[in-house]
Swiss-Prot record:
<feature type="modified residue" description="Phosphoserine">
    <location>
        <position position="1041"/>
    </location>
</feature>
<dbReference type="InterPro" id="IPR029060">
    <property type="entry name" value="PIN-like_dom_sf"/>
</dbReference>
<feature type="modified residue" description="Omega-N-methylarginine">
    <location>
        <position position="978"/>
    </location>
</feature>
<feature type="modified residue" description="Omega-N-methylarginine">
    <location>
        <position position="982"/>
    </location>
</feature>
<keyword id="KW-0694">RNA-binding</keyword>
<comment type="function">
    <text>Component of the oxidative stress-induced survival signaling. May regulate the activation of SRC family protein kinases. May act as a scaffolding protein enabling SRC family protein kinases to phosphorylate and activate PI3-kinase. Binds IGF2 RNA and promotes the production of IGF2 protein.</text>
</comment>
<feature type="modified residue" description="Phosphoserine">
    <location>
        <position position="1044"/>
    </location>
</feature>
<dbReference type="InterPro" id="IPR026784">
    <property type="entry name" value="Coact_PPARg"/>
</dbReference>
<feature type="compositionally biased region" description="Polar residues">
    <location>
        <begin position="1034"/>
        <end position="1043"/>
    </location>
</feature>
<feature type="modified residue" description="Phosphothreonine">
    <location>
        <position position="651"/>
    </location>
</feature>
<feature type="modified residue" description="Omega-N-methylarginine">
    <location>
        <position position="880"/>
    </location>
</feature>
<dbReference type="GO" id="GO:0005886">
    <property type="term" value="C:plasma membrane"/>
</dbReference>
<feature type="region of interest" description="Interaction with YES1, SRC and FYN">
    <location>
        <begin position="339"/>
        <end position="402"/>
    </location>
</feature>
<feature type="modified residue" description="Phosphoserine">
    <location>
        <position position="956"/>
    </location>
</feature>
<feature type="compositionally biased region" description="Basic and acidic residues">
    <location>
        <begin position="1022"/>
        <end position="1033"/>
    </location>
</feature>
<dbReference type="GO" id="GO:0005737">
    <property type="term" value="C:cytoplasm"/>
</dbReference>
<feature type="region of interest" description="RNA binding">
    <location>
        <begin position="825"/>
        <end position="1114"/>
    </location>
</feature>
């Protein structure tokens, strides 16, 4: 992209504009110009854009990032950085990108494609050479941004997160808070007249921690070399190509500037593909063109000249050209108002601007060449209203007319990070959560959301309406309503066109022209240089359920302060998230993609965030009281943008929120803000249930230390993957051994550790594990932070390099556990206990892979490309979702993740008995959630209709391993459905062993006995005989390994389970049917293993780590 290439152009072609500086000298207030000195007590205040600086805050491109991250090394570097800034009178404020930024989605799509290719290069390099990849392939370890954010909070460095438009909020925050400079690396900042602009890529801390250096960009020198007045930078930026008007739309214009005689003219169209000129050539040509513009205020004339070669969508391009000029004009001039969506916007939540009054920056000690007065680019005049840009791009959002009086709170509400570094529960932190009476300025108004939408598609009005529905609860249709020119009137910078070419041009022929390509209108084939450029396609989804205003206030407050996982605010207000690429081998089928592996976790988290369980329970109770049938609940759909094997990031996947079946999770307001002991326990239970780890051992510190809860939950979740086995015995031991190793807290020793040959599978396991940690942080924050954030940080339990060394020992040398623990018998005993806790109630008998289910049928509302792709073995469906499995014979290949909405008739038909089902086991749900063909059980079965046996069939051969007999299978048609008892935290799985594969079905303890019982009996004697004959069978089947069930959807055994990979000594604890937190409130409140909820309990290894890091830095 042209604008993004401008930063590299400065580095390469304007060396005089890049000046090295030492930040400590600037902070000391040395002589500047005529001898003025800065007051010594005034710190040098620098704003750091973390989005451009993550690799520097991580500690640089040292080679071991590929192993999953060396988090204690990063912690030591940040400790040294914080100490150097404190000693050098420098105040850092780190601004993280917490915005969804739909307006820049096409940039994200391109970036994900590049990172996906880089990931494959990394895997290939490690497989072929066994050495770390070069630093030019640096791919941030999973969860790196969140780990850096938590570490900065640990060292009392102020942080914040953007909420709508990251660049605008950073620029506005820098100006309105009196920061002396901005540390970043982005062309948008270079073109926005920042007073002092420093390079984030050049930021370096010396080894002794006394010198912090970087480079400063002198933009007036850049303007001098381009021979371009800075007042014309907005037009220059708009014509280079940007997120509003991409350079693909300007390709014809750029080629026309070069002319047919240019040496590169022959590259204009090659192999029927769109070819863009080199970026440096385009920058020089566009600078010459802008320099020669006679009247910069006549934007219509400029646009007419620029797009004279355009063959389609010219009106749309002109509109976006004007909007781009308005965007850069607004960010180039010093703001007399606060930036949008962040600082002093009329806030419906009763929250003040986050910043104090504007304080002009003081003079800095910078080279003499940079002291020249930098011209301020005034706003380009336009025929519009005063104070607006040439296009009505109004940052103040006049549509929001709420009063601003009475909205100021004290600054301490935004400075509530505990100084002691200890955990403070969410419900105890000060947040503006008190709702005001209706009619007051604090009253929530739905006008907040329509103006805040930045959807990149032409259905921007639906996105705004759907967001507004969170507050008002009004029902809106899926059809497009309202004027298409309304987003322009609001000045929404993110309004983009769809991939199929639809646009939001104002007036007249925009619909006919924009949609002509997709309705089959006879038109000439357009030139490649003028085809639609949106390389992503958005999808309209149903409106989200309303969310309590108190919850939204807390979510927005904590999101801005950087105290909450950013996905939470995105889900609550937008209903969509973006999932970054991780290191995965797409050529291998051994390991599933991280996006698919942890999708069930996200589905349950979505259900927690929207309080699905309680809302549906209330509705069912109300219908029961009124003697009505329970209503058909509309699915809650979340859009997930991700890129993995077989899935392009250009289209989102529609994922349905799920609720826990066996217990009713409280609503989000109570989960976050409740102060009772029961509420604390429900938070922990909700978190464990999301991670499928609701077992008593997880809360027993004798088995699982408190600071290792997240580690064990993630490993247990990975072990339960129903497809191909993810973790082998030695790999699980390697994870546990490195977490208990004393070397984990010695980053200097780890730096000296030599890895002879990197294991490709090891680096992929590390990436999968860190993806699980990422999702655990998401689930923990969504459930009210039951696990203290200090115990969630990965430096407490993981180091990628140490894991590689342990894995090489365990897998290649077949090292015994005692040797894997460096001869420490006590450490080996702890590993044994943790392994038993993780594997409690799980069964790992070898089975053949099931046949993939048929693909789901396409719906009229959703294109086929949005549905999940097949990848490896098929996991069971989770929860009571309403997926495509409602159609007989079809099932979702990765569980019930795709919503239906149009196939409700099929679900009703299934529930009323039009499809056969296993008798006694909630037949409607079984048939809905399990599609495909059932394999023949080993003991045969019989078919009954209305209680009469009409057929028998023989069984297949018994599976290998000497498994016990499976109960006789009975397929019943026409019998009454039986209910299902509560008491287990998640859905069990029945596995049928043999050559026929396996079938995933829902069941419970006595299902083997109940399945054999006919739905009708002819006489009392038959009933007596049946009960007598079944009593013994039920006892044996309940104790059999194939029939006994455990929690979390896996088969359990009362006898010791078989060893993983045939290793000896891996005994398991017997399965338990109760959850970690009993339903009885008395038992729940007196549980002695709940010290994870106490701030004064648990292991003190975190304190040891902090002391070690600080001592090492002193």
């Amino acid at each position: 992209m042209g604008v993004q290439g401008f930063q590299d152009y400065i580095e390469k072609h304007c060396p005089s504009a890049v000046v090295p500086v030492e930040l400590q000298k600037l902070a000391r207030g040395s002589l500047v110009g005529g001898g003025r000195q800065r007051p010594p007590h005034t710190p040098l205040r620098l704003l750091v854009d973390a989005d451009n600086c993550l690799h520097r805050l991580y500690g640089g491109f040292y080679t071991d990032w590929v192993s999953g991250g060396q988090w204690n090394h990063m912690l030591g570097y940040l400790a040294a950085l914080a100490k150097a800034c404190f000693g050098g009178n420098i105040e850092l404020f780190v601004f993280f990108n917490g915005a969804l930024e739909k307006a820049r989605l096409h940039e994200w799509v391109k970036r994900q494609g590049n990172e996906r290719q880089t990931a494959q290069q990394i895997v290939s390099h490690v497989q072929n050479k066994g050495t770390p990849p070069p630093k030019v392939w640096f791919l941030p370890p999973v969860c790196m941004a969140h780990c850096i954010r938590l570490a900065l909070i640990r060292f009392h460095v102020k942080v914040a997160q953007s909420i709508e438009d990251h660049h605008q909020e950073v620029i506005g925050f820098c100006r309105e808070n009196g920061f002396h400079g901005l540390v970043a690396y982005d062309s948008d900042y270079a073109l926005c007249n920042i007073p002092y602009y420093f390079s984030a890529h050049a930021l370096k801390l010396s080894r002794n921690g006394k010198s912090l250096t970087t480079s400063q960009y002198l933009m007036h020198e850049v303007a001098k070399q381009l021979d371009l007045n800075p007042n014309r930078f907005p037009i220059f930026a708009a014509l280079l190509g940007n997120h509003i008007l991409p350079d693909e739309d300007l390709a014809s214009f750029h080629w026309s500037l070069l002319g047919p005689e240019h040496p590169l003219a022959s590259l204009k169209v090659r192999a029927h593909q769109l070819v863009l000129p080199p970026c440096d050539v385009v920058i020089k040509a566009v600078a010459d063109y802008v320099r020669n513009i006679q009247d910069t205020s006549d934007l219509d004339a400029i646009a007419k000249d620029v797009f004279q070669h355009s063959q389609s969508r010219t009106d749309d391009k002109v509109i976006r050209f004007k909007r781009a000029i308005g965007y850069y004009s607004a960010t180039s001039k010093p703001m007399a108002f606060h930036p949008p969506h962040y600082l002093a916007r009329p806030n419906p939540f009763g929250m003040p601007g986050i910043v104090p009054p504007y304080v002009p920056p003081q003079m800095l000690n910078i080279p003499q060449t940079s002291l020249q007065a930098k011209p301020v680019a005034p706003q380009v005049p336009s025929p519009g209203a005063p104070g607006q840009g040439p296009h009505p791009y109004n940052l103040a959002e006049p549509a929001l007319t709420l009063e601003t009086s009475g909205k100021n709170l004290t600054e301490q509400n935004y400075s509530n990070i505990p100084h002691e570094g200890k955990h403070t529960p969410l419900y105890e932190r000060s947040s503006p959560i008190n709702p005001a009476p209706s009619g007051s300025p604090n009253h929530v108004d739905s006008a907040y959301f329509p103006g805040s939408s930045t959807s990149s598609s032409s259905d921007n009005d639906e996105g705004s309406g759907g967001a507004a529905n969170h507050i008002s609860g009004n029902k809106i249709g899926w059809e497009k309503t309202g004027s298409h020119s309304e987003p322009q009137a609001r000045g929404d910078p993110g309004d983009q066109t769809k991939a199929e070419g639809s646009s939001t041009a104002s007036s007249g022929s925009q619909l006919a022209e924009g949609k002509g390509n997709q309705i089959g209108t006879v038109q000439p084939i357009p030139c490649l240089l003028s085809m639609p450029t949106r390389n992503h396609m958005d999808i309209t989804t149903p409106p989200l359920p309303p969310v309590a205003p108190e919850v939204l206030r807390v979510a927005e407050h904590r999101h801005k302060k950087g105290l909450m996982y950013p996905y939470i605010f995105h889900v609550l207000t937008k209903g969509e998230i973006k999932i970054a690429v991780s290191i995965e081998d797409e050529a291998s089928k051994d390991l599933p993609p991280a996006a698919l592996l942890y999708r069930p976790v996200r589905q349950y988290v979505y259900g927690v965030l929207f309080s699905l369980a309680e809302s549906r329970k209330k509705t069912e109770r109300l219908a029961f009281r009124k003697n009505r049938l329970p209503p058909e609940f509309s699915p809650v759909i979340i859009k997930e943008w991700a890129a993995y094997k077989g899935k392009s990031p250009q289209t989102p996947e529609l994922v349905e929120a799920l609720a826990f079946r066996e217990w009713t999770c409280p609503n989000l307001k109570r989960l976050w803000l409740g102060k009772a002991v029961e509420d604390k326990n429900r938070r922990m239970r909700a978190f464990l249930a999301c991670m499928r780890s609701d077992t008593p051992a997880m809360l027993n510190p004798a088995s699982v230390p408190t600071h290792l809860t997240v580690l064990c939950c993630v490993l247990r979740y990975m072990v339960q993957w129903p497809g191909a086995r993810i973790l082998r015995r030695q790999e699980l031991d390697a994870f546990l051994a490195q977490a208990l190793s004393p070397k984990l807290y010695e980053p200097d020793q780890l730096q000296e550790l030599k890895i002879e040959n990197l294991d490709p599978r090891g680096i992929q396991l590390s990436a999968l594990f860190m993806s699980g940690v990422d999702m655990a942080l998401f689930a923990n924050d969504a459930c009210g932070q039951p696990v203290p954030w200090e115990h969630c940080c990965p430096w407490m339990y993981f180091d990628g390099k140490l894991f590689q060394s342990k894995l090489l020992k365990a897998s290649r040398e077949k090292t015994p556990l005692i040797d894997l623990c460096d001869g420490q018998a006590e450490q080996a005993a702890k590993v044994e206990k943790m392994r038993q806790s993780i594997l409690e109630g799980l069964n790992f008998s070898r089975q053949s892979h099931p046949l993939p289910f048929p693909p789901p049928a396409a719906l009229p509302f959703y294109p086929t490309s949005v549905y999940p792709r097949h990848f490896g073995p098929v996991p069971p469906a989770q929860g009571r979702g309403r997926g495509f499995a409602g159609v007989c014979g079809f099932g979702s290949p990765y569980g019930e993740t795709v919503a239906t909405g149009a196939y409700r008739a099929f679900r009703v038909a299934t529930a009323t008995g039009h499809c056969g089902a296993f008798s006694g086991s909630d037949s409607s749900r079984t048939s809905k959630s399990q599609g495909g063909i059932q394999p023949i059980p080993s003991q045969g079965g019989k078919l009954e209709i209305a209680g009469t046996v009409v057929g028998h069939w023989a069984g297949s051969r018994r599976g290998r391993g000497g498994r016990g007999p499976f109960p006789l299978q009975v397929v019943s048609v026409g019998g009454p459905a039986r209910g299902r008892p509560r008491g287990v935290i998640s859905t069990p799985v029945i596995r049928t062993f043999g050559r026929g594969g396996r079938y995933y079905g829902r069941g419970y303890k006595n299902q083997g006995a109940i399945q054999g019982k006919p739905p009708y009996a002819a006489s009392a004697e038959e009933v007596a005989k049946e009960l007598k004959s079944r009593s013994g069978e039920s006892k044996s089947s309940a104790m059999s390994s194939d029939g006994s069930l455990a929690e979390n959807g896996v088969v359990a055994e009362e006898k010791p389970a078989p060893q993983m990979n045939g290793s000896a000594g891996d005994t398991r604890a017997p399965s338990h049917s109760e959850s970690a937190l009993n339903n009885d409130s008395k038992t729940c409140n007196t549980n002695p293993h709940l010290n994870a909820l106490s701030t004064d309990s648990g292991c003190r290894r975190a304190d040891a780590l902090e002391a070690a890091v600080l001592k090492k830095e002193e």
